[in-house]
Amino acid sequence: MRFLVILIFVNIVIADYGGGYAGSGFQYGSSAREFSLAGALVADKTPGFCVFSNPALLQFTRSNQVGVSFQNMSLDRSIQSFNYAKRLPPNAGVGLAILQSGTDNIQGRNLMNQETESFSAKEIEGIMSFGVAFGSKLALGINIKAVFATIDKDYKGNGISGDIGFIYKLNRHLLIGGIMKNLNASYNWKVIIGEDERSYEEKFPRSYSLGMAYSGLKGISLFFQEDVMITPNNDVNYHTRIGSEFRLANKTKLRFGAKQARGTTPSGTIMNGLNIKPTFGIGTPLKVWQRQYTQLDYALDPGSVGEGLSHLFSFSFKF
């Protein structure tokens, strides 16, 4: 246990993240609950959004599930996601999902650093998922993803990739999960410069995640996830995530998490404080009619580098 605590601490302090690479717009989080728990959901049955966390979790689907997320963020950024999951008897599930991440009102500049027109950039990810259980302990799942990117009107990219995930049930309170993301993933860009069209390939970093979800404490769930990211240049970076969820008497849930705040820094850079960014949020069921409820989740992102507050909302329901 002491070694595990030291390992977690060291990974948080020296961790790196995937910003600045192809597909980084998909890493922020698909829902408010995911963000408030620091993204440590690779082994958790997230209602309405499990396709984004781990396709192997689809085998836990017992009814039709829908998840919708609206995230209007500072600096004209936004993320929207939709997820649909359906049970396939006796022990499988299928899902469809889409996520869009974008930024508006980007100020353009020419080679002389003079302001030109404003433009927008966005990334879209469409996912088809399937998960199946093999007995009572093990489940496997796959994602097939189509990705699209647009920067203004002259820069467009697309590609196809996949994910493979697993879930292992140690007991009814402890789940172990893992996923390999962005297998064979890249953008095939087409760029228009004047009257010429040029093409090139930009590869995604590969990501390997392993985590657990524990619900053996009364009214408390604990989550842990360790990510290993391998960049196109074969640099290896680490990312540790920890989350906790507290269930109150009125079915309201308080959520807290912690993840890295910064990536690697140049030699000689002075770092003030630990490399940790706290996350938090809340969730509550809302009655729609009779016995039908929808789950409302909220998370607040205070920002990492002074970019301002961002408010994240998600809705999920079963039918």
What do these predicted regions represent?
Residues 16-319:
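Subset of outer-membrane beta-barrel
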Residues 3-13:
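Sec-dependent N-terminal signal peptides
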